[in-house]
Amino acid sequence: MQTNITSTKMSILVTGGTGVVGRQVVKSLELREKNINIRVGGRDQDKCNQLGFGKNSTFTRFDFMDPTTWDKSLEGVDRVFLIALPMDPTPEKSLGPFIEKCKERKLKKIVVLSVIDAERVPLVKIEQMVQGSGLTFVILRPPFFSENFSEGFMKHDIDQGTIRVPVGEHSVNWISTHDIGECASIVLMDSKFDGRTIEITGPKPINFKELSEVVSKNVGKQIRFEDIKPQEYKKCLMDRGISEPSANYLNELFTSAREDKLSKCTKGVNEITGHDPRSFEQFAKETFSNTSGSCTSKPVI
């Protein structure tokens, strides 16, 4: 695949660098380019050490809620991968001032991880801030991550044996964080995608009845799907300790799913990487153990 990658040594800050997406961005950057410095932004250095990043990757303490960590994290950095805190109902309060800090430092590029149908959730405000910043940007819009079932908000349902969500017979085109990480690493370094908002999806949508059958096969126990009402789903989330604003955020995403906004199939991953994305079936086969009869997920690397 033809790329337009500069030979100048880059320094990239990956926010959320030890998270489910950020770690994939770091690992993909390490694989693609040796002549870069990678700052792994996070709050837990021990977790960073356990992930086994390469010698070009260095942990830096970074917290959107602690502006005193920003200057040191951005020192010498010319590009940033920007990801909001999970299910943050007001990302503009923390990311907005950070984007202003990036403007002050005249960064060369910001790559933002958003979501398909971002207009329904607060992430659209972050898109607008970056688009109006005057900085070079790329916005990536995925649907739900497949890894939500192994270490995200859907893992609870798998552990309990029943996927209970307000989605009916509608489908979602799940995407693996491996593909997101690879896409992000490329657009961070390659100028030909600059200024674009790109929707990236898996290869095909799958409804939740089909999905539960795929997971059952690979987990080694029966996983049921139960369609529930949005208000019941909100209560279930809050009973698990998820805040009401975050529960509302997730409900909005499932509204997008019921309107078939998350079932679209785009060529975004192929356009950026030159290969097709992983399917949900491939994710399930690679991720879940089927030897114990329980939902045990392998580490996502």
Swiss-Prot record:
Pfam families: NAD_binding_10. GO terms for molecular function: NAD binding; NADPH binding. The gene is padA. Belongs to the NmrA-type oxidoreductase family. Involved in development and cell differentiation. This is Prestalk A differentiation protein A. Transmembrane segments: none annotated. InterPro entries: Ergot_Alk_Oxidoreductase, NAD(P)-bd_dom, NAD(P)-bd_dom_sf. GO terms for biological process: aggregation involved in sorocarp development; positive regulation of gene expression; sorocarp development; sorocarp stalk cell differentiation.
